[in-house]
Amino acid sequence: MNMLNEARKEEVLELAKVLISQQSYSGHEGGVAAELEKYMKANGFDDVTVDKYGNIIGKIKGNRPGKKALFDGHIDTVPVANPAAWVHDPFKGEVVDGKLYGRGTSDMKGAVASFTAAANFFAKDTARDFPGEIYVAGVVHEECFEGVAARSVSEIVKPDYVVIGEASLCNLKIGQRGRAEIVVETFGVPAHSANPEKGVNAVYSMCKVVEAIRSLKPVEHPVLGKGILELTDIKSTPYPGASVVPSYCRATYDRRLLVGETKESVLAPIQALLDDLMAKDPAIKAKVSFAVGEEKCYTGNTIQGERFFPGWLFDENDAFVQDILTELHAIGQTPEVTQYSFCTNGSHYAGEAGIKTVGMGPSRENLAHTDNEYIEIEQLAKVCQSYYAIMKALLK
């Protein structure tokens, strides 16, 4: 049976349009959450919850006990930096030549619309005669904090399986590198720049630190690749200098995380390097830590956390992955089994909580955050069928 007739395709498209029409930069996702709540309640979801951060969670309960499958998608987007660069209004949801245009179409309101509708269709077609529970979650603040708001979702749901809806061109993702933001600080002694010998220049100390860090060899994983450590910015204090020897300097590094790496194992080689530098040159004073982020949620609450988001990887031969592939093959889909090249909420579900997790989403990864972002309507329909098949695979 083809579960996605023309009326249902239109329903998915209309829901995606409605979500796109709601501007939802990080911390301002309330409008999208309200639209999802409206759709869920209109279609008989058993429960709709909005947590302290503003995550919205819909639940459909099967008639028999069983596993819990959670479909996760973030509902925040990056800002539109230059509206004049857009041919189509980023918040109108215009359809042109088989493409739906707008901020968040590919990243990732199209996926959220598709799996929310798929849950509705699955419940109706089965008359809820399935074991277990389906949850769909619209998660906030992912663009700032991959996985931090998702912690609240998994505490509420306690899922057995998670499906991340991030863009994959409808291929199946079974892992990703994680990400950490590492801060290295050097501390000097201020002095007038006319008499620099009376102070200690924190920037010169940082130059030595940066050069030493460049000598570190990245760890490597046979599937996920290198645990890259890349310098992304340096700032000194005071700035502007105004004839003052800088007494403080801060460098930020982007570190890509591999499976099994911990906060301690990631910082240890940098700390050892700093200890060696400080032992050789008493003028150098330095420390290393993870960046801490704090953001305001649309609910008024604050979300906060260290910027450390673990990597994760499952085996293609794991039973739950094979079950999913079997159902996808049954509807004529033959996805590649690969890994995401970017960080997702899977950092929490799989990396921190150890929950069986896969990713599948519509559209291309490289359309995220672009001017004139779009999603092909054919991809919306295809992934809706995929999510329906995955529900069948996990809830049996």
Question: Which residue ranges define each predicted feature?
Answer:
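Glycine/serine-rich anion-binding loops at beta->alpha junctions
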Residues: 98-114, 192
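Residue-level signal for inorganic ion chemistry
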Residues: 19, 23, 166, 206, ...
